[in-house]
Amino acid sequence: MSSSTANVDPAELAKFSELAHRWWDLESEFRPLHEINPLRLGWIDGLAPLQGRRVLDVGCGGGILADAMARKGATVTGIDLATKSLKVAQLHALEAGTPDIQYREVSVEALAEESPASFDTVTCMEMLEHVPDPASVVQACARLVKPGGWVFFSTINRNAKAFLLAIVGAEYVLGMLPRGTHEYAKLIKPSELATACRSARLDVLQTRGMEYNPLTRRYALSGDTSVNYLMACRRAEA
């Protein structure tokens, strides 16, 4: 993919732009991201402590994870191509007094050309299933992290169980997400993501599943990667 061609689906941008003002409403369509945030934040910080690190959050949206990582002591840059979401993230950081955080409207591929090997940690959470070319995003993340640095991904598996739970259940039965949030064909199997990571010269060190309890509204790590899963990678030392 050329650097002049944005790896973005206009329909996806429009979808999130329409909801931008609700990013920080804990009872909105983004409630699942707020509920999942403590789990993914703890997982990231446990493997690659955030204190004093330079971190990039790819597809940051309204800044839910980026803000939390900054509060853990990281210097955070959040990037996204949804202008309205970025404005919400910037306003929240200003109102909350979040330290050491900035937001930019730039593609991950363009930033990789501009600032390769610039970050200790790169996160790309719940984003790959929304772009036309996820492998391009993985390649760019690998270029942006320093040798020895960590890259974290999370996405949704592609199988019948994931379709029933993450799409039919979450969007149509429970109403946890707006209908049409996810497209089955864009979901990514762990083996496919691992292949993309290895092609980008990232070592896959850990893959964990995430399970949701609708009664307690809490997520927990598990060994079951059949629906939501996380993948931790490292770039080899130079």
UniProtKB/Swiss-Prot annotation:
The keyword Zinc does not apply. SUPFAM superfamilies: S-adenosyl-L-methionine-dependent methyltransferases (SSF53335). Pfam families: Methyltransf_23. Gene3D superfamilies: Vaccinia Virus protein VP39. Keywords: Methyltransferase, S-adenosyl-L-methionine, Transferase, Ubiquinone biosynthesis. O-methyltransferase that catalyzes the 2 O-methylation steps in the ubiquinone biosynthetic pathway. This is Ubiquinone biosynthesis O-methyltransferase. The lineage of its organism: Bacteria, Pseudomonadati, Pseudomonadota, Betaproteobacteria, Burkholderiales. The gene is ubiG.
